[in-house]
Each structure stands twice: as C-alpha cells, then as structure tokens.
C-alpha cells in the first residue's frame, strides 16, 4: 500500500508550487532533464502507449528557431527560460506497443481506427505533460506550461523529420518568485465535483 506523502512534499508538488513567468539566470543540467523524464515516463497511460515525445530546447540557437512560432504574450518568458520542452506526440505511437504492451495485440486497436489513435495520442501525451511537470517539481525545478504558439510552425521547424505533432510547451528552470502573479483562486470541491 502506498504511503501518504509528507505535508512538505505535497506542498512542493501542489499547494506551494506555482506557474512561473520569470526565470533566474541559472542553467538546468541535462542530467536533471533526463532524471525528470525517467520519473515522468512511469506515469500511467492507456495500454502503456506512452505517445508523448519531448524536445528540450536549451541552446540560444534553438530558442531563436522557436521564436517565430511563439505568441507575443509568451515570447519574453520563453526566451528567458533555461529550457522549453516541446511536449509532442508520435501519431504512430502504436508501433511501439508490441514492446510496451506485449500481453495483447494492442497495436491493432489503433491501426484499425485513425480517429482513436489521434484521440489516444493527444489525451495521453497531455497526461504525460502533467507527469513531467510533477517530476520537475519533485526535482526542485519550476515550470510554466502554455499553449500560446503556432503548432504548425513548431511541427515544421522541430518535428517534421520524425513526424511528431506538438501538443503544448513547458518552460522549465528556476523561477523568479519576484515575477509571480498573485495566486488565482481555484474552484471549491462542491463547484467542481460530484459524489454519486
């Protein structure tokens, strides 16, 4: 049976964690990104399909290539962030299912239905983006997920060779607490939940 995390750990992952828009001038080591991925990959996905693919934009040259695809509101914070992760998905993720889900012929579920494949890839890569955020927080990093970018441009610039499709971006680094907005409210349990 799983143990309940300490209040401090829960605060790190949830109640004290924030979405950052400003970043300290402090690099993120590649080894830490690898560690975050190794944690995030363990989160559940449908039939262990693991459709997410991650491109970590770290160099100034790569950031310049990303720049034209960003919306104006996301430009400054993304260029300042030490790392921007493109969370993408592989449309033919199901080709890995004989390895990832050997107990069943799960590949055929998706080759017979392109609509199901696309829906599954998008939903589960979104889940995996959330796992990456939690993994980064657990490792002392801050994040800033966002949708304000031109998907087609990102796909053409960074993903075309592999055929992946972008879902969202996540800025990663060490957040500048002086650039935080006041925390916005969240919906109460009774506003967002039902127990039937």
Curated annotation (Swiss-Prot):
Reaction catalyzed: 3-hydroxypropanoate + NADP(+) = 3-oxopropanoate + NADPH + H(+)
Superkingdom in the source lineage: Bacteria
Keywords assigned: Flavoprotein, FMN, NAD, NADP, Oxidoreductase
Cofactor: FMN
Alphabetical GO biological process terms: nitrogen utilization; uracil catabolic process
EC id: 1.1.1.298
A molecular-function term among this protein's GO annotations: 3-hydroxypropionate dehydrogenase (NADP+) activity
UniProt keyword Oxidoreductase present: yes
Pfam families: Nitroreductase
Role according to the record: May reduce toxic product malonic semialdehyde to 3-hydroxypropionic acid, which is excreted.
Recorded family membership: Belongs to the nitroreductase family. HadB/RutE subfamily.
Protein name: Probable malonic semialdehyde reductase RutE
UniProt lineage: Bacteria, Pseudomonadati, Pseudomonadota, Gammaproteobacteria, Enterobacterales
Encoding gene (name): rutE
